[in-house]
Each structure stands twice: as C-alpha cells, then as structure tokens.
C-alpha cells in the first residue's frame, strides 16, 4: 500500500499527517508514504527529520476576499493539480489523505480526476474551503469533534504524536524541568504562539516578566522563529536570583514542554487544543483575532468544561496577565481541578482510528480495481 498525505503549511496541518504516517508504519513497515508540501512550509524541515519522503508542489493560497490574487488562482491550481497527478502516478498511490490547507485542495482534485479514493480529516471547529469541497465527493471524512459539520463525517479526534498521546505529566515533570533548566518546584508558565509565534502574546509576556518574577513564577517562552530577535531585544534586565526565564525560537519536544508547565498561555489552534486536553494541561487560550473565528470555537468546549480560560487578543494590551494569568498559575488547587476537566475531553487514539479509515479506503479501491 502507498499513501499520499496532503498536509503542508503550518504545524497544525503537518503534525497530524506525520502522526498518521507513523501509525501506518507501525502497522506495516513496508507501507509507502509520501507527504505533499510547499517549498515555503514548515514541512521542508519537519518531514525529512521524521524520516518520510516529501514531494513539493506549488502552494495555492485561496484569498478570503475579492483581490487581484483571485485572478491567479485558476492557473496556479491547474499547475498544482497536474503536479499531484504526476506524483500519484509515480508512487502508485492507493489512497490520498488531506488535512486541509494550501496543498489539500490540489490533492483532492487530482485524486478525484484520477479515480483515487481519498480521506478528508478536519481538525478545526469551522472547516476551511478545501475540506468543505473535498468532503462532498468522498465517503471517508474524519473530524475532530461531533459538532463539526461536514458530509459523511465520523468524529475521531486529532492524531497526536505518541510521546504526547502517552504522556504522564506528573511522572515526567522532574525530567522535563531539568531538560529546560527550570526549577523543580516553582510555578511554571509555558508560553507558545503557534509554530510561527504570536507578536501580541510575546510582547505581553515580556512586559509582564518583572511582575511574574516578583511572584516567583518561572517562564518557558517559545517565541517562534520569526519573533525571537524582537523578544530577545525587548527583555528587561533580570536579577541574578530571579526565577528562570527560558526563551526558545521553537520546541521540538512539546511533550516535555507540557510536562514542565503548570499552565499554558497560547493560541487556540485545533492541534494545540487537542494536545492540551489529552495531557490534561490547563491553559489560557488567546485565539487569533482574524481569520474565520475557528480558533475561538476550537477552545470553546474546553473552556466551557472548565479546563481553560478564554482571553481576547485585545485584552493582552491591558493588565490581563496580572488579572488572569498570575492568580491562576500560582493556584495549585484550581490548576488541579482544571487539569481533570481538560483531560476528560481528551482523545488519545485518533491516530489509530484514522489509520483504520485510511486502510478501509485503500481496500475499497483494491476491490474496485
């Protein structure tokens, strides 16, 4: 069996695709796997590092508004679909799996044109255009949650890396804090703005560092590769005996980040929400203020269950860290209660369930052919 995965662009698309690839390979070491991506996406680094083949196609951004860029979409899409068709033929693909994003729509179109079965996986509470279109023409549609409305949808969750899906935070806490050079006992706030970073979150945290230090809170700050220089230059002077402040551009070991943290301050991407629920880590979610509002909807079930707090991006310009984050990160009893409520919503086996669906789709093709 050969599987082609279309999930490039951001970590929220790439990581579930890679996790599915690993689940398929655990079942059959001989399975062929090719990931589709674009030359400018994170996949150019992440996919080879995990040992899988990467095939690059032209990205086809779909403007949300009427702009001159819309005029270029048809020609770009034709070129990308043609390239995917070539890859499907060269690999002898049995099934394609799309995760939304810039490379998914060309993948779905190429699969449909060539009669190849394909699987759609939608992680976001509000599906994007590629998956809304793709779900109309296949029986194999998986969604993160039953509330996500797509044709033929089966709620399976979001595939999570094994080290996260199997994480015992309490058992790994000492190891994780030592790994990052953090104190073993101090209240610990982890900050992450997604794979590209978040300027508003970064600026608010840097401004609040003296206050957090005065309260004995140590900070593990993943600023994003595009934001790291700005954060480094804006840091205030710190006393030699101040609680630890660890600044990173990117974290490849998010399992250890989650094990080290008492509380996350983060965006509300679908993958982030799924991971935090699965490991039972309370969070203050700051959804992206633009887009189609899917990040707020991603966090909504966790917040309503009491496993997280929702904070508007605009509130970061005020004293939200003093009012909301600081009292929470130092309240162990409340954090423990929130952890349990978040964990009750977590799903840890979505990789295996999605692998079942992929094998079902591939088997249907073999029966037909």
Curated annotation (Swiss-Prot):
Catalysed reactions, semicolon-separated: di-trans,octa-cis-undecaprenyl diphospho-N-acetyl-alpha-D-muramoyl-L-alanyl-D-glutamyl-meso-2,6-diaminopimeloyl-D-alanyl-D-alanine + UDP-N-acetyl-alpha-D-glucosamine = di-trans,octa-cis-undecaprenyl diphospho-[N-acetyl-alpha-D-glucosaminyl-(1->4)]-N-acetyl-alpha-D-muramoyl-L-alanyl-D-glutamyl-meso-2,6-diaminopimeloyl-D-alanyl-D-alanine + UDP + H(+)
One Pfam short name: Glyco_transf_28
Keyword Cell wall biogenesis/degradation set for record: yes
Transcription among keywords: no
Entry membrane topology: Peripheral membrane protein
GO molecular function terms listed in the Swiss-Prot or TrEMBL record: UDP-N-acetyl-D-glucosamine:N-acetylmuramoyl-L-alanyl-D-glutamyl-meso-2,6-diaminopimelyl-D-alanyl-D-alanine-diphosphoundecaprenol 4-beta-N-acetylglucosaminlytransferase activity; undecaprenyldiphospho-muramoylpentapeptide beta-N-acetylglucosaminyltransferase activity
GO biological process: carbohydrate metabolic process; cell division; cell wall organization; lipid glycosylation; peptidoglycan biosynthetic process; regulation of cell shape
Annotated positions binding UDP-N-acetyl-alpha-D-glucosamine: 10-12, 124, 161, 195, 295
Subcellular localization: Cell membrane
Matches recorded under SUPFAM superfamilies: UDP-Glycosyltransferase/glycogen phosphorylase (SSF53756)
Keywords, comma-separated and alphabetical: Cell cycle, Cell division, Cell membrane, Cell shape, Cell wall biogenesis/degradation, Glycosyltransferase, Membrane, Peptidoglycan synthesis, Transferase
EC number(s) reported in the record: 2.4.1.227
One Gene Ontology CC term in the entry: plasma membrane
Listed pathway(s): Cell wall biogenesis; peptidoglycan biosynthesis
InterPro entries: GlcNAc_MurG, Glyco_trans_28_C, GlycoTrans_28_N
Family membership noted in the UniProt record: Belongs to the glycosyltransferase 28 family. MurG subfamily.
PANTHER family: GLYCOSYLTRANSFERASE, UDP-N-ACETYLGLUCOSAMINE--N-ACETYLMURAMYL-(PENTAPEPTIDE) PYROPHOSPHORYL-UNDECAPRENOL N-ACETYLGLUCOSAMINE TRANSFERASE 1
Function text: Cell wall formation. Catalyzes the transfer of a GlcNAc subunit on undecaprenyl-pyrophosphoryl-MurNAc-pentapeptide (lipid intermediate I) to form undecaprenyl-pyrophosphoryl-MurNAc-(pentapeptide)GlcNAc (lipid intermediate II).
Official protein name in the record: UDP-N-acetylglucosamine--N-acetylmuramyl-(pentapeptide) pyrophosphoryl-undecaprenol N-acetylglucosamine transferase
Species in which this protein is naturally found: Acidothermus cellulolyticus (strain ATCC 43068 / DSM 8971 / 11B)
């Amino acid at each position: 069996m050969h599987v082609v995965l279309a999930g490039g662009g951001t970590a929220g698309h790439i990581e579930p695709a890679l996790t599915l690839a690993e689940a398929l390979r655990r079942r059959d070491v001989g399975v062929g796997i090719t990931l589709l991506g674009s030359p400018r996406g994170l996949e150019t680094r992440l996919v080879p590092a995990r040992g899988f083949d990467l095939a690059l196609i032209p990205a086809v951004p779909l403007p949300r508004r009427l702009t001159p860029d819309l005029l270029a979409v048809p020609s770009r899409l034709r070129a990308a679909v043609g390239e995917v068709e070539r890859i499907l033929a060269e690999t002898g693909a049995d099934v394609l799996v799309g995760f939304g994003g810039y490379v998914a729509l060309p993948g779905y179109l190429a699969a449909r044109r060539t009669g190849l079965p394909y699987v759609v996986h939608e992680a976001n509470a509000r599906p994007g255009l590629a998956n809304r279109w793709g779900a109309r023409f296949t029986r194999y549609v998986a969604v993160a949650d039953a509330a996500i409305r797509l044709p033929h949808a089966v709620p399976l969750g979001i595939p999570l890396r094994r080290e996260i899906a199997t994480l015992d935070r309490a058992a790994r806490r000492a190891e994780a804090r030592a790994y990052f050079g953090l104190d073993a006992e101090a209240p610990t706030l982890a900050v992450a703005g997604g794979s590209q970073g978040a300027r508003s979150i970064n600026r608010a945290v840097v401004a609040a560092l003296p206050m957090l230090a005065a309260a004995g809170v140590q900070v593990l700050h993943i600023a994003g590769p595009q934001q790291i220089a700005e954060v480094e230059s804006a840091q205030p002077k710190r006393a030699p005996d101040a609680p630890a402040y660890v600044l990173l551009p990117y974290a490849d070991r998010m399992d250890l980040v989650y094990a080290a943290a008492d509380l996350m301050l983060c965006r509300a991407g679908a993958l982030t929400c799924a991971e935090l629920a699965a490991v039972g880590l309370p969070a203050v979610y700051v959804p992206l203020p633009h887009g189609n509002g899917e990040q707020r909807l991603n966090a909504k079930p966790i917040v309503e269950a009491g496993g997280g707090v929702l904070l508007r991006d605009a509130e970061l310009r005020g004293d939200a860290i003093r009012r909301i984050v600081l009292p929470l990160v130092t309240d162990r009893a409340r954090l423990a209660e929130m952890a349990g409520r978040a964990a009750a919503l977590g799903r840890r086996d979505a990789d295996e369930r999605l692998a079942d669906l992929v094998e079902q789709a591939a088997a249907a093709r073999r029966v037909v052919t």
